[in-house]
Amino acid sequence: GFFALIPGIE
């Protein structure tokens, strides 16, 4: 998601 370090992992 938005707060993930790498976009897309959560």
UniProtKB/Swiss-Prot annotation:
GO terms (BP aspect): monoatomic ion transport
Localization terms from the record: Secreted; Target cell membrane
Keywords for the protein's UniProt record, in alphabetical order: Ion transport, Membrane, Secreted, Target cell membrane, Target membrane, Toxin, Transmembrane, Transport
UniProt GO cellular component terms: extracellular region; membrane; other organism cell membrane
Principal location: secreted
Keyword Transport among UniProt keywords: yes
Annotated GO MF terms: toxin activity
Entry keyword Methyltransferase: no
Subunit architecture: Monomer. In aqueous solution exists as a tetramer.
Similarity remark: Belongs to the pardaxin family.
Function in brief: Exhibits unusual shark repellent and surfactant properties. Forms voltage-dependent, ion-permeable channels in membranes. At high concentration causes cell membrane lysis. Shown to be 5-10 times more toxic, cytolytic and active in membrane pore formation than pardaxin-2.
Protein name listed in UniProt: Pardaxin-1
Organism: Pardachirus marmoratus
Lineage, top ranks: Eukaryota, Metazoa, Chordata, Craniata, Vertebrata
